[in-house]
Amino acid sequence: MTNIIRNTTGFAVHIIKEYITPDSIVVDATCGNGHDTLHLAQCGPKRLYAFDIQEQAVASTRDLLVSEGLSEALASGRIKLICASHSDIDAYISSPLDVAVF
């Protein structure tokens, strides 16, 4: 038997991926180094918005996503990286959210 509880991120991804469908609108409210954003993107949501107030965090997230083959998702707008506080979410997203992580 595989132990899925190796770390909190792995455990959270295991649970969250059950709720993300190809029609889901998903938010990573604090993208940081991009690892959670990457996991969410790999679940295949319709849209993924990743917020951070630090430009370096957004740049690091972009670099990670590109290195993992998600350039097209970024270019198409399926994944949107936003350098702003998640408290300003209403300025960027008008549709209901299906999943949000902090």
Give residue spans per PLM region.
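Glycine-rich phosphate-binding loop of nucleotide-binding enzymes
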Residues: K17, L40-Q42, I53-L70
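Conserved Rossmann-like nucleotide-binding pocket used by diverse enzymes
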Residues: V27, Y49, I82
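A general structural motif
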Residues: D23, P45, P96-L97
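Residues at the starts of beta-strands that form the adenosine-phosphate
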Residues: I25, K46-R47, R78
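Conserved proline-anchored active-site loop of SAM-dependent methyltransferases
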Residues: A29-C31, L97-F102
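S-adenosyl-L-methionine
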Residues: M1-I25, A29, H35-Q42, A59-V99
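Conserved SAM-binding motif I beta-strand of class I
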Residues: R47-I53
